[in-house]
Design a protein with these regions (language model features):
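An active-site-proximal structural segment forming one wall of the substrate-binding cleft
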Residues: 1-15, 37-53
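Histidine-acidic metal/acid-base catalytic patches
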Residues: 6, 12-14, 44, 69-88, ...
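Short beta-strand segments at enzyme active-site cores
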Residues: 13-21, 54-60, 153-156
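Surface-exposed, active-site-proximal loop segments in enzymatic domains
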Residues: 21-35, 163-170
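Conserved beta-strand edge residues that scaffold enzyme active sites
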Residues: 22-23, 64-65, 159
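Short coil/turn segments at secondary-structure junctions
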Residues: 26-31, 59-62, 125, 129, ...
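Glycine-rich "substrate-gating" loop/helix at the edge of Rossmann-like oxidoreductase active sites
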Residues: 35, 65, 98
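Aromatic-lined carbohydrate-recognition surfaces of secreted/lumenal glycan-active proteins
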Residues: 55-67, 91
Length: 190
């Protein structure tokens, strides 16, 4: 992870996003509490290195049954247990929605979050659709994000574009819709 933090530092990034056990943890042979402990220890160590280099690590909730951090409660517990001044939560709105959380649950992350991924989904999988192209009602989520009074940033997260020849339009639409929603929520001037 140090090489990734070095790269983030070299390119002037603010943080490095870390996903814990998206696909690799079976929770069968090695008890989940042991896996959790290893993750806490590794993130603390990485947090030391990040802080030495003026960076932060933000942890992302993944809504998969085998993920170490797959609910808002586990996200808050993990960040608190790591207890490091350079380690925070990344709130990926579509992931939080897919985990079954309600907007009010974001309050559990007050003081613990420094970054937001903003994308939509079909309600079944996180396809990182442009905001407004899926099923999420973003207004209550934006109200809760505003109440967190986070020092971090909101970034639009887009992945697979089904029409590669329209990728520029896809990105522009995502930006326009996000700017509109944020302005309506009082989070951004038009």
């Amino acid at each position: 992870m140090k090489a990734h933090l070095d790269l983030a530092h070299d390119i002037g990034a603010r943080n490095l996003l870390l996903v814990l056990g998206e696909y690799i943890w079976q929770k069968e042979v090695i008890p989940p509490s042991v896996q959790w402990g290893w993750a806490v220890e590794a993130v603390r160590e990485a947090g030391d290195y990040a802080r030495e280099n003026g960076l932060e690590i933000v942890i992302e909730l993944e809504p998969f049954s085998m993920s170490i951090v797959n609910t808002v409660d586990l996200m808050a517990a993990f960040i608190r247990e790591v207890g490091h001044p350079a380690v925070f939560a990344n709130i990926d709105v579509s992931h939080v929605v897919l985990s079954g959380a309600q907007p009010s649950e974001l309050r559990k992350l007050k003081g613990l979050a420094h970054h937001v991924h903003f994308s939509d989904c079909d309600g079944k999988v996180h396809g990182d659709l442009p905001p407004g192209k899926g099923v999420i009602d973003f207004a209550p989520w934006l109200r809760e994000l505003a109440a967190l009074d986070m020092p971090g940033v909101l970034s639009i997260e887009l992945e697979f574009c089904p029409q590669p020849d329209r990728i520029v339009e896809w990105v522009r639409d995502a930006y326009r819709e996000t700017a509109r929603m944020m302005a309506e929520a009082g989070l951004r001037q038009r």
